[in-house]
């Protein structure tokens, strides 16, 4: 059986229009890179109708909740990085722990983690944020009427969409995992490859949200259905949890490098801090990379040396900034990055046990959008695993997340991605769980030049890091930069480098890495699903990762 995975969707859009902004960018048309053909078509449709980047993002997110149910959602949460009228913004609509959650809720009487309790079933679900997040983004920046943006998704739910072969395989794996544990099979058991899949209950839910806005989801009939499902399945989410949910507008993480500015996710995502550290440490070791061939054994070793230090810091320090004091400034300080860079061994593996925190003590979906005014949206949202917790809200037709696994159920014990955490990411009521989602926007001279994101759990920021290297250091065309081999190392398991079947480590490179002492492992799923748009003057370029089933389109005015 194929492993059930964590998925992320990615989409990018741009369109030409008149603008009065000082950061205006009149483009040759629009563009979209989305994780499936339906999301791409809807984004293009909204742009042609005069919608802006946020309008296209909202419509695409709701569409993917229908056509990409393994990750697209209204029962999960996410992050959105925006660049509007020359100013960066970050919207945190991550799920939160229910009020009844506790630090020991996934432990047995002996204090050990109960297998799969934080991954499968109603108790794995955090309070969803997607509907409120999309509403708040639209309320602040949208142009087209809210109800119009849900119309395409409602149509696909009512009339169906053609199930892709790969999507059907994910469904098969999920049925095996959830069999007898959730009601997943009642809703998705009749899905067949190549045939239309209809979701009438979900269509009615989306119609109610289109008509009444987020109050329908958090306080209306949909909320009643969700709470009834929780009570039936012994979950924790209550009416009060839903009514109290709020998004957070935060200052985006900013990284300046090579004349570019990267805007990406701040805490409670680890991705922004990680990207700042990865880029900063690499810059301090520039001499080691000089003349080194892309994805050679030496190049991969240098990446592993940097990545293991970033993951050591992630495990010890990072969590929800509303609950824990996180030393962000110190972790990204140039002097600290120089110190960490000095620890890198360019020729041999640094012993894992000596790589400590440097200070004193799946499935996810992403889309990216750029409009003619130079505005951009980079959005990542998720259910965590493929099809989340496997629990479908009866009568409402949507899946609930299993994001509670992103907390540290027990400090020092790995989650489903093999990533460990500390008390900074321990479970507390109302707390946002740590994430790796890293929706990113690159600007140069105040104008958007790249919008990029990917799924992949702990592989998200290492994948984006490698794509940035491919573009800015190796000067690869966007499609080749996205398609190139990617690898991953995260400190633990010890001296292990992961690859995927799309671009396996083999031949001379593999032998050289093994000779250095590395263990090479096929992780069993794709190393991300990058969706990217590049803006060069007026020209638009899209790239949809060949590892997935995404589509890139240029939209002419």
Swiss-Prot record:
GO CC field: periplasmic space
Ligand binding (L-glutamate): 94, 382, 384, 403, 406, 435-436, 456-457
Keyword Hydrolase appears in the UniProt entry: yes
Pfam family, one: G_glu_transpept
Posttranslational mods: Cleaved by autocatalysis into a large and a small subunit.
GO annotation (BP), single: proteolysis
Keyword Manganese carried by entry: no
Active-site residue list: 364 (nucleophile)
Superkingdom of this protein's organism: Bacteria
GO molecular function annotations of the record: glutathione hydrolase activity; leukotriene C4 gamma-glutamyl transferase activity
Reactions listed under catalytic activity: an N-terminal (5-L-glutamyl)-[peptide] + an alpha-amino acid = 5-L-glutamyl amino acid + an N-terminal L-alpha-aminoacyl-[peptide]; glutathione + H2O = L-cysteinylglycine + L-glutamate; an S-substituted glutathione + H2O = an S-substituted L-cysteinylglycine + L-glutamate
Annotated EC: 3.4.19.13, 2.3.2.2
SUPFAM superfamilies with a match to the protein in the record: N-terminal nucleophile aminohydrolases (Ntn hydrolases)
Signal peptide: 1-24
Keywords: Acyltransferase, Glutathione biosynthesis, Hydrolase, Periplasm, Protease, Signal, Transferase, Zymogen
Subcellular location: Periplasm
Family per similarity comment: Belongs to the gamma-glutamyltransferase family.
Protein name, entry field: Glutathione hydrolase proenzyme
